[in-house]
Amino acid sequence: HLGVRRQRQMCIRDRSYGSQRISFLSLVKNCNHKGLGIYYLLSAFIFGISGTLISVLIRIELYSSGNRIISPENQNFYNISITLHGFLMIFFLVMPGLFGGFGNYFVPIFQGSPEVVYPRVNNFSILILSLSYLFVILSLISEFGGGTGWTLYPPLSTSFMSLSPSSTAYLIFGLLMSGISSCLTSLNFWTTILNLRSYYLTLKTMPLFPWALLITGGMLLLTLPILSGALLMVLADLHSNTLFFDPIFGGDPIFYQHLFWFFGHPEVYILIIPAFGIISIIISSILQKIIFGNQSMIFAMSCISLLGSVV
């Protein structure tokens, strides 16, 4: 098959990165799935450190009454810390680490394929993720910061009186770019799992980990466009004088909550289902046995994803 042969040639060519001196250009050009998986894990670790430092600051501030770190002149910084901690831990630590990192490293191995279907798209996804992190951090130093909470509920996120509009815009841009990265990674996993399986590997005999990523990718592709639409409506209310969520002029702020939690509730299972697959790998490898009840576990994860998206 011409496509598989081309992927093998690209994979062999990119595996030579280990013998070369690592530079920024080599990081940008690398399309090897193992290298990108390691980059995802390292990026998630760095992003997680920043989120952890913010949580430490919150705990120090709450250690006793009164102001300990946050100055009385900038009380909004506490709300900014809560917002950034939620964004960094959910969208930049757990999702890139479990889904992008372990997925890129192990999915082609379990499928018996040399690479993912679209290596360049895979590389583009992690570059977008890094850029989205910069946008989120930029919101911290832009004007007074976006202290909206990680849910970005209107009217707080659309009000000029309580926050900085440019900071909220940076937060929204960061989330939109992170969503694009997750959607591209999900499409890559879906096409790899369904089209680049080995001849002897069927969906019934496929291990739990590829199944977990297949289900997780399906939830991301279903829910992230809804969240992106809601965020664009908030951005339009904030900068384009639209009135989607302004109750004074006939808007409905509850409508945003419906749109957000169509993503927010499946997000809980998007974070945990890849961990189910990773635990199955660990148990199977340590015991040198096939997981008992493989089909039942696949059915359970599918029902979890369906019910989580409907509720």
Where are these regions (language model features)?
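Membrane-interfacial loop-to-helix junctions in multi-pass inner-membrane proteins
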Residues: L25-L42, Q111-L131, S162-L175, L194-L220, ...
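Membrane-interfacial alpha-helical segments at the cytosolic side of multi-pass membrane proteins
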Residues: F91-G103, S228, I270-I286
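Membrane-interface helix-loop-helix modules in multi-pass inner-membrane proteins
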Residues: R59-W190, R197-Y200, V234, S240-F245, ...
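Membrane-embedded translocation segments of transport machinery
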Residues: P247-P253, L259-V268, I272-V311
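Single conserved hydrophobic/aromatic residue that forms the stacking wall/gate
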Residues: H1-R8, I12
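Hydrophobic alpha-helical membrane-insertion segments
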Residues: S43-L53, S125-I141, I215-M233
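Membrane-embedded alpha-helical bundles that constitute the cytochrome b-like, heme-associated redox core
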Residues: Q9, S19, S23-F24, L53-N67, ...
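Membrane-proximal N-terminal segments immediately preceding the first transmembrane helix
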Residues: R13-V28, V107
